């Protein structure tokens, strides 16, 4: 087992996975069991995360030296800059902010 887990916790997780739900009530019960497993494995700090924050996805951003445009924005510490060069001429790439 990995650090912080016990055979009982692992067995509980295996039981949850092997007994897939057949209806909405069973799905709710399974969700509660999985939340208990998360709490046991990762601590109680996960149980305090609001539901909308836990399920929301962060917007994706382009990293350094990745092509960018008006739909694909650069990450916070980068800016979309037009480059000069050979085949990549007139394309924009994410570069570190100047100044």
Curated annotation (Swiss-Prot):
Principal place of residence: secreted
Family annotation (Pfam families): Toxin_22 (PF08092)
What exactly does this protein do?
Answer: Inhibits voltage-gated sodium channels by binding to site 3. Insecticidal neurotoxin.
| Keyword entries, A-Z | Cleavage on pair of basic residues, Disulfide bond, Knottin, Neurotoxin, Secreted, Signal, Toxin
**Name of protein:** Mu-hexatoxin-Mg1c
List the top taxonomic levels of the source.
Answer: Eukaryota, Metazoa, Ecdysozoa, Arthropoda, Chelicerata
- Classify the source by domain of life: Eukaryota
**Domain annotation text?**
The presence of a 'disulfide through disulfide knot' structurally defines this protein as a knottin.
Which InterPro entries does the record cross-reference, listed alphabetically?
Answer: Toxin_22
Q: A single GO CC term, please?
A: extracellular region
